[in-house]
């Protein structure tokens, strides 16, 4: 199954993956602050993007990342309790780069410079509800499955409906 493209729907909180074999849907969670492109907004950027980098291949599904680097920690409920306010980035990171100059590429709206990712989140976090700080959160099993099949350059389109 080769992945052709990905669509993130902000209204339905769904990650739709278009493959040579059909369509696969995954629940996701985007920004609590809604759609938007400005640096510092905490919003999920709209428009056409591409996967710049895939980070974490070969790491355990519950590997913890800070600054796109594995910390050596493994997420557990006990670790979570010790850091209740941490914005957990787990498992895999698909780092997005905007394709639309002026909308999500360049200046104060650059998705890559804003560190917008599709990444794993703890199983205690709900899907289908916008709660992130701008990234697209997915269940650990789902992001690991997606990261294993996607390649850099894959187009990711983020739409409002």
Give short role names for the model-derived ranges.
Residues 1-4, 27-41, 73-80:
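N-terminal post-signal-peptidase region of extra-cytosolic proteins
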Residues 1-9, 146-147:
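Short linear motifs in intrinsically disordered
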Residues 9-18:
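Gly/Thr-rich phosphate-binding beta-strand-loop-beta motif of the actin/hexokinase/Hsp70
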Residues 10, 22-50, 55:
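Glycine-rich catalytic cores of cysteine/serine-nucleophile enzymes that process amide/ester linkages
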Residues 13, 55-58, 161:
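Short, charged beta-turn/beta-strand-edge "cap" motif at the junction between a beta-strand
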Residues 20-21, 110:
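A short, structured loop/turn motif at beta-sheet edges
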Residues 61-161:
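Exported/periplasmic cell-wall-interacting domains
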